[in-house]
Amino acid sequence: MRKYSPLMVQGTTSDAGKTVLVAGLCRLLANKGIQVAPFKPQNMALNSAVTEDGGEIGRAQALQADAARVKPHVHMNPILLKPNTDIGAQVIVQGKAIETMDAWGFHDYKKLAMPYVLESFSYLSNNYECVVIEGAGSPAEINLRENDIANMGFAEAADVPVIIVADIDRGGVFAHLYGTLALLSESEQARVKGFVINRFRGDISLLVPGLEWLEEKTGKPVLGVIPYLHGLNLEAEDAIKSEQLDKGKFIVKVPVVTRISNHTDFDPLRLHPEIDLQFIGKGDSLSGADFIILPGSKSVQADLEYIKSQGWDKDIERHLRYGGKVMGICGGYQMLGEHLADPLGIEGVPCRVKGLGYLSISTELQKQKQLTLVEGTLALPNQNAVKVKGYEIHAGVSTNLGKEHIPISIHTKDAMRYDGTINDENSIFGTYLHGVFDEPEAFEAILTWAGLEKCQAINMHDIQEEAIERIAKSMEDSLDLSLIWPDVFEKNKAY
């Protein structure tokens, strides 16, 4: 197996474009026939993905694996932090949750985490021809440098070259790049191979004097300037993506709870031309919706109380009274039930609380998570059964207390199992499946059930593929990658 130099992409800030840049590089290398894997030593996100072997990684790394045309693997994101309070997060190591830690606890744990990070990187290096690595936040955060495993601490330990990307759309790009480099140690500066400027709009000739100044002051080349790509429909890692090209007439409202998880579930709705998807924040109302969906949550009991504090439970009651439909996904499904019990204190203090009481289910949180990729059939009332795909990430086990309709049949190696509940009035539907809207047939079935006439789904896989290819083409045109991989790419004018 031929080997190519690994490369680490670090950023001057969060949301500088590291995730997209790594995805684009993975696709460019894959298009050249190179077996490439993405890698992020440490990620913090509430959006996670499930691997085939039942592990949990950041959704960004699953997206990057798709860009590389390989299957997601737990070693692509060995340390995942999922915040469940303002000061604490569940720590997931090589796909498995170990415990919840506060900031100081994890700071001390990083010394123990580095061997897992290096083990995962070694696995990828041995099994792929090239590894493209994503940093986290900025490498110049002085307070986080001790025992760092996410940025230069990893780069030094693994001896990998680095490029630094900055978002010019935010302003201050030269201060960001020059200042970030200046705050690094001499050995760290030496492994920086160059800079990339992201999201540029306008005439690049006006930028050239600044680029020349930066190269002269730092002695580092600018590898290129990537233009701002409008309408790039990729999953957002952290912030909820609410941009819509067109707003349809069918209004879907999603209450934004404090620990909302896997909000990428709603991307097929956001991109659909007949749907007006609205994320409803603090102080706003759910009134006026055609369809209300309660999202997943990392802290179900706390977010249930938040829903009540905002008066959204009253909005839901009124919505149902006038014939509206309501759906709950994962944590949202649990909230719609009779009770939520947490005897082990998984989410904090052991307790048992009342749910919204719309579905005859009772949920108990357990230490062992359910982490599964799912395929099966969805049979909503008065509709033909259709194909459904998705994934489960939850610690709760829900027991059906009545004889309400269970709409989803899941195919497993051993036997059939079942998921979800629909109430007798056919107005409320709950499921544990994240990604339930991604399969076109399931999308059409659920939205038809919810009241959208003549519903026709969009193909999320095709939309993602188009976006990844756009990124790759833009980077191929904009960057001089011969400075990193001279045996793969021809020399290109950087600017």
Curated annotation (Swiss-Prot):
Which GO MF terms does the UniProt record name? ABC-type vitamin B12 transporter activity; catalytic activity
Instruction: Print the keywords alphabetically.
Output: Cobalamin biosynthesis, Glutamine amidotransferase
**Which residues act catalytically here?**
C330, H434
GO terms classed as biological process:
cobalamin biosynthetic process
User: Where does the record place the GATase cobBQ-type domain?
Assistant: 249-442
Pathway(s) the chain acts in:
Cofactor biosynthesis; adenosylcobalamin biosynthesis
UniProt cross-references to InterPro entries, sorted A to Z: Class_I_gatase-like, CobQ/CobB/MinD/ParA_Nub-bd_dom, CobQ_GATase1, CobQ_N, CobQ_synth, GATase_3, P-loop_NTPase
From the record, give the cysteines joined by S-S bonds.
none
Q: Which Pfam families match?
A: CbiA, GATase_3
Task: Give the family this protein belongs to, as stated in its UniProt record.
Answer: Belongs to the CobB/CobQ family. CobQ subfamily.
Function field? Catalyzes amidations at positions B, D, E, and G on adenosylcobyrinic A,C-diamide. NH(2) groups are provided by glutamine, and one molecule of ATP is hydrogenolyzed for each amidation.
Q: What is this protein called?
A: Cobyric acid synthase
Organism annotation: Aliivibrio fischeri (strain ATCC 700601 / ES114)
